[in-house]
Amino acid sequence: MRDRTQCVAVPTQAFNEILDQDGQLTAYAQRLEQLRERGSHRVALLRGELARIRQDQVLGMPEKRVQVAAHRLKISEAQAVARQCKTEETQLVRKAVARVRGLFRDFDCSVRDAMREQRLLLKQVATVQHTSASSDQREHCLAQLRQCKEARHHAYRSLVEKSAALRNGKMTFIERVVRALREYSFNFDATQFFLANGLYIAIAVFFIACIVVAPFSGNGNLLTIPNILTILEQSSVRMFYAVGVAGIILLAGTDLSIGRMVAMGSVVTGIILHPGQNIVTFFGLGPWDFTPVPMAVRVVMSLAVSVALCVSFSLFAGFFSARLKIHPFISTLATQLIIYGVLFFGTSGTPVGSIDPYIKDLFGGRWILGTMQGTLVTFPKLIIPATIAVAIAWFIWNKTILGKNMYAVGGNAEAANVSGISVFGVTMSVFAMAAVFYGFGAFFETFKANASAGTGQGYELDAIASCVVGGISFNGGIGKLEGAVVGVIIFTGLTYCLTFLGIDTNLQFVFKGLIIIAAVALDSVKYLKRR
């Protein structure tokens, strides 16, 4: 009868020792090496030498041609030997691989027997009264189970590696897939998985439920191309705000002035692009009429002024945070109030009116793609600039020195300063970069609705929430830009789905609040676990 407990203490390399000590397997491997020495191995060696000869800059062309011809002849001879040995080699490989698998089955069976025994012991320990000795025995059983699990994992890895070596380095597709699955299963941690993906799983279930319920609500099918494109269109402009504030959150900060900056840029854009004389005055100045100015100049002017104003106010807030160490929550709150007061008092809250219809269609219109099942399908133009903005931001985050420094400063500002990184410079750069995205977003916001001092109300909360849901930590130094993008789409899709199903607008805030608190709670748990 097999001694089961002996297998429990087998080290993780025990199966390798079994393979090395098996005489029959060693004989197979030696014979295969002999067959390949003058065949496939020699072909590979000669091809390597041939490549070096061709790249040699010292050899003259006549000498190089002679050596190339000689090596080609040797390669042909080695290939002929390999073909002669092919049948015997194939049979040996089949027998050797079968031998390895047989040894693995025996080893795996013995380890599984030991694991069953340890599980039985654990059950017995659980039934007895809790004492110090029983606690020690339980820990011992758990340690033995972990050791057995590692032994099985390393044994299977050795099985695949040995089989590939016997096949001269070749691995079957099935072996690759099974090995990947077993590696994932071995390293899988349910707690970490649900901490990282639990919120997304819950949101995915919610969206699936909405898709299933929608036809029964009498509102039609939710999962259609026009609806998806509408969600992406509504996400496009808000993508600028989330991408901008994401950098500030990465520095363990926040920005409460987004909505007011959007209003400021939108009002300026609306005034400049309005057809004819505008009714809006600013501190008694105006009204203005920019129609004599060429349209291209007006577009560039409105965009430049929107970006310049946003950058100015953002740098104002950033200076107090970077130089005086005032938390961005306070500095951006002050900026928000300043912009709101100046803008509302200066314009009396008067809407700027519509903008030139040609420009509105040029930037904010749609391209007609055709019809699908009797429904006209159009592609929103706003998706294009949003995609470009995300691509530029991704490049800055991942491919530039500023991006690397953002993670360093966000993770530990003091350590970054000691290592020679200018914390002040990085902070100011991030605030300026965020403002550029706000300015562009405010410019495109004008094409959605008439701008006024109240435009953008609450946008900062949606942008910040999108970043948090996307995995950008408030603790700083953790997160990816892609997360902010996904967060924007999730929140926009959530609002669209609830509206599509006829859910009251006020009740939608409840769903948003639950998602935000869940995201922040999971982020806090992950942060505490890392500490």
UniProtKB/Swiss-Prot annotation:
It is found in: Cell membrane. InterPro entries: ABC_transp_permease (IPR001851). The keyword Transport applies. One of its GO terms (molecular function) is transmembrane transporter activity. It is a multi-pass membrane protein. Its main location: membrane. Keywords: Cell membrane, Membrane, Sugar transport, Transmembrane, Transmembrane helix, Transport. One of its GO terms (cellular component) is plasma membrane. Part of the ABC transporter complex MglABC involved in galactose/methyl galactoside import. Probably responsible for the translocation of the substrate across the membrane. The complex is composed of one ATP-binding protein (MglA), two transmembrane proteins (MglC) and a solute-binding protein (MglB). Belongs to the binding-protein-dependent transport system permease family. AraH/RbsC subfamily. This is Galactose/methyl galactoside import permease protein MglC.
